[in-house]
Amino acid sequence: MKYRDLREFLNLLEQQGELVRVKQEIDPYLEMAEIADRTLRKAGPAILFENPKGYQMPVLCNLFGTPKRVALGMGQENTQALRELGKLLAFLKEPEPPKGFKELLGQLPQWKQILNMPSKTRDNAACQQIVIEGDAVNLYDLPIMHCHEEDIAPLITWGLTITQGPHKKRQNLGIYRQQLIAKNKLIMRWLSHRGGALDFQEWKATYPDKPFPVSVAIGADPATILAAVTPIPDTLPEYAFAGLLRGHKTEVIKSISNQLDVPASAEIVLEGYIDVNETALEGPYGDHTGYYNEQEYFPVFTVTHITMRKDAIYHSTYTGRPPDEPAVLGEALNEVFIPILQKQFPEIVDFYLPPEGCSYRLAVVTIKKQYAGHAKRVMMGVWSFLRQFMYTKFVIVCDDDINARNWKDVIWAITTRCDPSRDTTLIENTPIDYLDFASPIAGLGSKMGIDATNKWNGETIREWGKPITKNQQVVQHIDELWDQLGL
């Protein structure tokens, strides 16, 4: 499924019955979030609210509300194909030189895909058809959703934030929520380890008296949005990876007020700066954990320009107790993670992030165990190999006879193969999601690893239990009789 911008993608979704246009007047205050939540929970379509109460601009919600639509957005036909995408990312993360001509030929499809990666800069673009600047800038003209009753203010949720460190050639793309506090001001809530925050810290150290340039794209094409949340190698620009997903180069254009590249087809672009000394108290907001989070000070983004397409579409979402869009994204990207992990740890059979674990807080791993202590090595590998799992609080490791995606299997393994004292690993003072109020200190908490594998010599001195198996001849015979038994 190939497309060039968000509108073309929406047309394709509509043709497949994956998009519904709502013509009734719907309020961005609470009503849109309620409709989107109900729709997502029944795996319903993307929604285009064509008549937002009090606004002229339509609002797009639930775009990535099913794993299938995430896969389509990444240029794949289904979630199974995301495994192949993960293999390509594993190849890009650690490319190995071919061992011979035959292997070189086998790698040609991968290198052909890589040719689509560099972005293409345009001189003019749809995202700058309308330009608003200076005193005319008014963020209250945008139909920014207010998702939960106790949220402090409307919140931009799908803004693609573009930044660049003072000593870096690569520009960073990230998704950070932004609280509306004035007609030209937003609070930029980014965690300290995220790319935008790192760029900002480097800028502050280099230019302590100069404003930090920022651009935010709303309504970019799905490949570019998803590139910003995918575990790509640090050396690979998100625009380049988006080109790979899309099958043709990402088209960008320079921002009007700074040198940052923005998606040429974006619906809306906010341009401006962060004063290195200006912060504001952010929140509380209902978030993906299902709770309202604490308040904290974050940098203030001052918007100097708004550019947009004619008849622009505002792209939004809500977050709440799973399932929500972040949980669905995590479920789909789970398939991308597996080949990347297997590249480093070939013994991994499956890796699963249960959606009810708030996308990433708990992982279940199944392995082909090869030696005593193997499960602990895998735990450490999961926590350290990809930055995405820095905040994973619980890692459960099972043997490959356990289905990682079946809680009945996993609970059976924990209760029959695990001794709490011997098989539980606790690590203190590790990075934890700032939103995790269960941690004793904001941003710092503990992790637990559970070894639910069969124990080898050196791990136990007892005779290990032998699993019960059925006599297959008897099973086959009863299968043949079953319809006659009246049961």
Curated annotation (Swiss-Prot):
UniProt xrefs under Gene3D superfamilies: Single helix bin, UbiD C-terminal domain-like
Localization of this protein: Cell membrane
Free-text comment on the cofactor: Binds 1 prenylated FMN per subunit.
EC number(s) recorded for this UniProt protein: 4.1.1.98
Top-level EC class as recorded in UniProt: lyase
BP GO terms, sorted: ubiquinone biosynthetic process
Keywords from the UniProt entry: Cell membrane, Decarboxylase, Flavoprotein, FMN, Lyase, Manganese, Membrane, Metal-binding, Ubiquinone biosynthesis
UniProt entry tagged with the keyword DNA damage: no
Active site: D287 (proton donor)
Annotated catalysed reactions: a 4-hydroxy-3-(all-trans-polyprenyl)benzoate + H(+) = a 2-(all-trans-polyprenyl)phenol + CO2
Gene Ontology cellular-component annotations: cytosol; plasma membrane
Signal peptide residues on this chain, from the entry's feature table: none
InterPro entries in alphabetical order: UbiD, UbiD-like_C, UbiD-like_N, UbiD_bacteria, UbiD_Rift_dom
Amino acids binding prenylated FMN: I175, Y176, R177, R189, W190, L191, R194, G195
Annotated positions binding Mn(2+): N172, E238
Function: Catalyzes the decarboxylation of 3-octaprenyl-4-hydroxy benzoate to 2-octaprenylphenol, an intermediate step in ubiquinone biosynthesis.
Subunit structure of this chain's protein: Homohexamer.
Family named by the database record: Belongs to the UbiD family.
PANTHER family: 3-OCTAPRENYL-4-HYDROXYBENZOATE CARBOXY-LYASE-RELATED (PTHR30108), FERULIC ACID DECARBOXYLASE 1 (PTHR30108:SF17)
Protein name: 3-octaprenyl-4-hydroxybenzoate carboxy-lyase
Organism: Haemophilus ducreyi (strain 35000HP / ATCC 700724)
Lineage: Bacteria, Pseudomonadati, Pseudomonadota, Gammaproteobacteria, Pasteurellales
Chain's gene name: ubiD
